[in-house]
Amino acid sequence: MTGCGMNSTNSGQPDEPGPGERSAEEVFTEFMDAMEDTVQHSGANWPNWDRQDTSGYFPPPCSVRTRDDGRAYQTQIEGGPVDDPQAAVDHMKAHWKSKGYTIGNIFDDVNPATGMQINARTPRGMLVQFSPTRNGSLIKVVGECTLDPAARKKTT
């Protein structure tokens, strides 16, 4: 999401790092954990996802203080179908709420496959999106923006 606005907050806690101040390692771990958590609670099969494979991520620019001064890890993965997209969205919504996520837009019938899409934000502003359909499913996560120069390198 080149040129996107700030997506990092500190939840108003005085002892937490402010926007962009967390290390690339911290935000990458949280990003990967959010992917894994969503995969585990999706009800779909994700044959191309491996939480242990951390190589090849090169985060595009994001903005913390000035345009494109940070980096945010992001990816989208494709998975198998779900029999009941509504039930899958309801389950994910309840799960995300239990984790303190803010539930955003929920779309139904977003494509010819009669699927759905649910969007949420973590307490630190990471975007998590789950789109289950009867033909296949998608998960997209856009991590927290970090100013750490280490995030400018492709993960290995």
Predicted regions and their residues:
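Intrinsically disordered/low-complexity terminal segments and short unstructured peptides
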Residues: 1, 8, 85, 154-155
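N-terminal leader/targeting segments
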Residues: 2-68
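Active-site oxyanion-binding pockets that recognize sulfate/phosphate
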Residues: 21-24, 78, 82
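C-terminal basic regulatory modules in eukaryotic proteins
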Residues: 27-34, 142-156
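Extracellular/mature segments of secreted proteins
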Residues: 68-75, 152-155
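Extracytosolic low-complexity repeat regions of secreted or lipid-anchored proteins
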Residues: 80-144
